Amino acid sequence: MGTNNTSNNNGTTKKMSLEEFLGNDTLGESVWDEEDINLDAISNTTNIDILKQTKAGEHQRDGHQQHPHGGHGPMNRSRFSNAGPFGGGSMGDFANHHHPLQHQQGPPYIVKFSDLPPRFSNFDIEDLFQAKFTKFIKFKLFWEINKNPSISTLKSGSIFDQNFKRDSKVAFVELYTSRDMDKILNYWTTPLKEIYHITTAPAEFEDFKDYSTKVKLLTDPKDDAGKPFITKTQRSKSNPFGSAKPVDTQSKILDIEEKMENLHVEDTTTLRASLIPSSDSMATTATGSKITILKKQTPTEEESHSATPTPKPLSYSEVVERSVVNETSKKGTPLSKLDSPALELQSKPDKSDEFKGGDEQGFEKGGDDKAQLDVSNDKDKGSETDVDKQFTFKNVEREHSMSRTKYNGNHNNNNGNFRGSNRYRGGPNGSSYKGGHNNRGNRGGYRGGSSYNNNNNNTNDNNNNNNNSSSNNNNGSRYHDRQNNEEGLTSDSSLDASGNKKNDFTNSTSNTQQYSIFKPASGFLGQGNNDSIRNNGRGNYNSSGMNGGSRGRGFGRGRGFGRGAYNNRGSRGGRGSSGNYSNYNNRTTDMPL
């Protein structure tokens, strides 16, 4: 057996294939017999202490008393020689290679972090170890010790300045195991130094005691190293204006305003004089400058007497009266006062409605003679009452309705104007008589008054009842008819012996009809006779010849019969409640509305 081994060692080594190795029976028939393997020994956990004792026994038995790398530990052996569980002591050899053996002696395992910035705090230490997934037992922050203080600092400096510096801090961290310490020293040192300028090294216990002793001298809580210390640097602002200074204009303005209030004057020359120094002001006052204050001149006696007195405020009735007068004057209605007292209207003894008050207007009597009307028309005077007195209206039950003027057919064309003037709406009307040579009727009077137009153009031009008229026409009469007249007045036309038309105004009550206050346009209800048409408001009675028709406006603003076919066109009706009434001749009949 020994000769074979020597021959094999001396000769070339024969390589065995896998088949030859499996078929070799040199080590026994069942090399891979599972029964020969102790499974209990494999399942047991290997104890590090047992391995250490085993290795120590082997070293003592072999007579090796010194570590191969020269490291000496207590009891003449290295502390980290067999620290690794995997044998060989490689972890301990690597640690001893980088650091002296005296720093690795037993717990506590403490690492020192130096050159920390002043803002470093307890939170930053915890954050660092949490980021690296490393646990620690405890830590302590200190200010860096001032090892060489200056003489001035030792004499006049504070306790903190004599022992510590505020430029940097140090931290001592105690770890659980030596593996954590080796990890920090091997893998954290270079990044922390390059990025944060932090130095990492194993801590010495004597150094830790020195820091702990000096920190007890600090009593001010502001000197706690565990809190961040941030120096407040005041930045000096650069003046954008350089050496220039802003001008104080506000004080000057306030000074000027104060002087203006004291002087109570707005004269700029006086203000300037007040701003001049005292020496200059004396010179200016010596020249005799005076302050002139502008005031409103009081009026003299002559001007005060010549000035018109302030008019008194007008009452409501006076304002209404003036407005009515202005309107009538604009329309060109002649208003003439009577020299004689107003004539009273003849009335029957059984009249039920009458006008009471100082503002009464007289009506011309209706006579049998047409010459009387012509004379009154020639005088061109209307009755007018005193307007300064108040007008009152007594509204009693009426037996007679308002007067209606009825005009039957005639053989002539009569042209007349009737334009009523109404000082108070709904009051009596002042009438005027004005003849004219018109083939066309005119508009009616003011609201509440009735108009009567009568065309009397004589074909022979030989009958002129108006003595003062220079026209070739028979002037019609102008007549105002109140909507609430005390009597019903009718106008009947007839022919005299000479063939001329004769207008007779008589008092008639046979054709009267009850008037409804709530139905001012009661004729609109369909009554067919001529009396149903009430001449209220501004309506006109237009008659234009034998076959002519008038284009009057009916009840409200409706249109009447239409434009005449043969003769002149009728005049426009008013806005009152009455419409226009057209008559052709004696033989024509009135058309119902």
From Swiss-Prot:
<keyword id="KW-0488">Methylation</keyword>
<feature type="modified residue" description="Omega-N-methylarginine">
    <location>
        <position position="447"/>
    </location>
</feature>
<feature type="compositionally biased region" description="Low complexity">
    <location>
        <begin position="449"/>
        <end position="477"/>
    </location>
</feature>
<dbReference type="GO" id="GO:0000172">
    <property type="term" value="C:ribonuclease MRP complex"/>
</dbReference>
<feature type="modified residue" description="Phosphoserine">
    <location>
        <position position="150"/>
    </location>
</feature>
<feature type="modified residue" description="Omega-N-methylarginine">
    <location>
        <position position="551"/>
    </location>
</feature>
<feature type="modified residue" description="Omega-N-methylarginine">
    <location>
        <position position="538"/>
    </location>
</feature>
<feature type="compositionally biased region" description="Low complexity">
    <location>
        <begin position="534"/>
        <end position="545"/>
    </location>
</feature>
<dbReference type="GO" id="GO:0003723">
    <property type="term" value="F:RNA binding"/>
</dbReference>
<feature type="compositionally biased region" description="Polar residues">
    <location>
        <begin position="505"/>
        <end position="516"/>
    </location>
</feature>
<feature type="modified residue" description="Omega-N-methylarginine">
    <location>
        <position position="425"/>
    </location>
</feature>
<feature type="modified residue" description="Omega-N-methylarginine">
    <location>
        <position position="419"/>
    </location>
</feature>
<feature type="compositionally biased region" description="Polar residues">
    <location>
        <begin position="231"/>
        <end position="241"/>
    </location>
</feature>
<comment type="function">
    <text>DNA polymerase alpha mutation suppressor. Suppressor of group II intron splicing defects of a mutation in MRS2. May play a role in mitochondrial mRNA splicing.</text>
</comment>
<feature type="compositionally biased region" description="Low complexity">
    <location>
        <begin position="408"/>
        <end position="426"/>
    </location>
</feature>
<keyword id="KW-0597">Phosphoprotein</keyword>
<dbReference type="GO" id="GO:0001682">
    <property type="term" value="P:tRNA 5'-leader removal"/>
</dbReference>
<feature type="modified residue" description="Omega-N-methylarginine">
    <location>
        <position position="575"/>
    </location>
</feature>
<feature type="compositionally biased region" description="Polar residues">
    <location>
        <begin position="280"/>
        <end position="290"/>
    </location>
</feature>
<dbReference type="GO" id="GO:0010494">
    <property type="term" value="C:cytoplasmic stress granule"/>
</dbReference>
<protein>
    <recommendedName>
        <fullName>Protein PSP2</fullName>
    </recommendedName>
</protein>
<feature type="compositionally biased region" description="Gly residues">
    <location>
        <begin position="546"/>
        <end position="563"/>
    </location>
</feature>
<feature type="modified residue" description="Phosphoserine">
    <location>
        <position position="522"/>
    </location>
</feature>
<feature type="modified residue" description="Phosphoserine">
    <location>
        <position position="340"/>
    </location>
</feature>
<feature type="compositionally biased region" description="Basic and acidic residues">
    <location>
        <begin position="56"/>
        <end position="65"/>
    </location>
</feature>
<feature type="region of interest" description="Disordered">
    <location>
        <begin position="227"/>
        <end position="248"/>
    </location>
</feature>
<dbReference type="GO" id="GO:0000932">
    <property type="term" value="C:P-body"/>
</dbReference>
<feature type="region of interest" description="Disordered">
    <location>
        <begin position="280"/>
        <end position="593"/>
    </location>
</feature>
<feature type="compositionally biased region" description="Low complexity">
    <location>
        <begin position="578"/>
        <end position="587"/>
    </location>
</feature>
<keyword id="KW-0963">Cytoplasm</keyword>
<feature type="compositionally biased region" description="Basic and acidic residues">
    <location>
        <begin position="347"/>
        <end position="402"/>
    </location>
</feature>
<feature type="region of interest" description="Disordered">
    <location>
        <begin position="56"/>
        <end position="101"/>
    </location>
</feature>
<feature type="modified residue" description="Omega-N-methylarginine">
    <location>
        <position position="440"/>
    </location>
</feature>
<dbReference type="GO" id="GO:0005737">
    <property type="term" value="C:cytoplasm"/>
</dbReference>
<dbReference type="GO" id="GO:0003729">
    <property type="term" value="F:mRNA binding"/>
</dbReference>
<feature type="modified residue" description="Dimethylated arginine">
    <location>
        <position position="443"/>
    </location>
</feature>
<feature type="compositionally biased region" description="Polar residues">
    <location>
        <begin position="486"/>
        <end position="497"/>
    </location>
</feature>
<feature type="modified residue" description="Phosphoserine">
    <location>
        <position position="238"/>
    </location>
</feature>
